Design a protein with these regions (language model features):
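Catalytic active-site module of serine/aspartate enzymes centered on a nucleophile-bearing elbow/loop
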Residues: 288-321
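Conserved loop-alpha-helix segment in the C-terminal half of the alpha/beta-hydrolase fold
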Residues: 258-298
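Gly/Ala-rich beta-loop-alpha elbow adjacent to hydrolase catalytic centers
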Residues: 131, 135, 139
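Conserved alpha/beta-hydrolase catalytic His-Asp/Glu region
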Residues: 190-261
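Active-site glycine-rich loops that stabilize anionic/oxyanionic intermediates
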Residues: 41, 49-52, 133
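Flexible "cap/lid" loop of the alpha/beta hydrolase fold
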Residues: 144, 150-192
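Serine-hydrolase catalytic-loop signature spanning alpha/beta hydrolases and amidase-signature enzymes
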Residues: 49-59, 70
């Protein structure tokens, strides 16, 4: 396949070990023939954050694609990929939905395996994984699964996942009291759906973006639409339900502690949700972390808020391979 001509809505059928299949939407930019699958330059695979899609890399794909094959895929439950019904611990599939293509447990193992299998089946060569927010946790898990096929990871404002049970010691004491009630409530589909429908409105999306993008750069109608449109698909609320019920899953520090590949960090100093102090601690704590670039005027999604700066930093990192 000439991947320089791959349309934005390409679909890869992800065949599971149990025989079930899920559809994964993906796109690729590769401007020159020498960037084919036999190139010695690692390809780049971009992994989006919660509620986003591969389109969130709109300002990065074309630029990075001039250097090497660059891919962006939609995680299961998001964008144009399959959106199976979310199963929580102890739940059974509804009648007629035993097939994993219709109902499954959303998890970082699921998404990490998706990215790893995509790299092996579609990219077919060495890769560097770049992840934003929860996409960073996914990238770390995928790097573990890929082993030598993954040459390195770049984390952009990686998610801390403070609501995980393992983070309880870092939370206020009152959180331990209300936590059982909170977990019981958000497990209810009627409530998670109501919360999702409230959040999945253009006005609310724009309001959240103003927090995530403190400079206001690139908050435009295109951005709001690319985030809003996938929320109108029939199964969109299910990924939301699955994610907000992830109370015992992988944390980035645990993955970093067991990672063999080099990791570079890019962080917005004004991120309202993932403090830069955590990135600074990671730089000192984990031997796999080789660099930290702090962007003074950026927030949670600097790759879209300050794409020129992030693209230059990514190109500098890629030159190390």
């Amino acid at each position: 396949m000439d991947q320089s001509l791959v349309p934005a809505d390409s679909i890869w059928t992800w065949k599971q070990a149990d025989g079930c299949s899920l559809e994964v939407a993906w796109q690729c930019h590769a401007d020159t023939p020498e960037q084919g699958q036999n190139s010695s330059v690692p390809a780049v695979v971009l992994v989006h954050g919660f509620g986003a899609s591969g389109n969130h890399w709109r300002h990065n794909l074309p630029v990075l694609g001039k250097r090497t094959r660059t891919y962006a895929l939609d995680l299961i439950g998001f964008g144009g990929s399959s959106q199976p019904q979310a199963l929580l611990a102890g739940e059974q599939p509804a009648l007629g939905q035993a097939d994993r293509s219709q109902s499954l447990v959303y998890s970082f193992d699921l998404w990490g395996q998706q990215v790893a299998d995509f790299c092996k089946a579609v990219v077919q060569g060495p890769v560097v994984l770049v992840g934003n927010s929860i996409g960073g946790v996914v990238a770390l898990r995928a790097a573990q699964l890929l082993e030598d096929h993954c040459k390195g990871v770049v984390l952009i404002d990686c998610a801390q996942r403070l609501m995980d049970d393992k983070q309880l010691a870092t939370q206020p004491a009152w959180m331990a009291w209300i936590r059982p009630l909170l977990k019981a409530l958000v497990s209810q589909r009627w409530l998670s759906t109501a919360l999702f429908r409230n959040a999945a409105r253009p006005r609310v999306i724009r309001s959240v973006l103003k927090q995530a993008y403190p400079s206001g750069n690139n908050i435009d109608d295109q951005l709001v639409e690319l985030l809003y449109k996938p929320t109108q698909r029939p199964g969109a609320a299910e990924a939301f339900r699955g994610f907000i019920n992830l109370f015992n899953d992988h944390l980035a520090p645990d993955l970093l502690d067991n990672l063999q590949q080099p990791v570079d960090l890019i962080w917005g100093q004004k991120d309202p949700w993932e403090p830069v102090s955590e990135a600074q601690e990671w730089e000192q704590r984990f031997s796999c972390v080789r660099s930290l670039k702090i962007l003074t005027n950026a927030g949670h999604c600097p790759h879209d808020e300050s794409p020129e700066v992030v693209n230059n930093e990514l190109i500098t990192i890629l030159k190390k391979y």
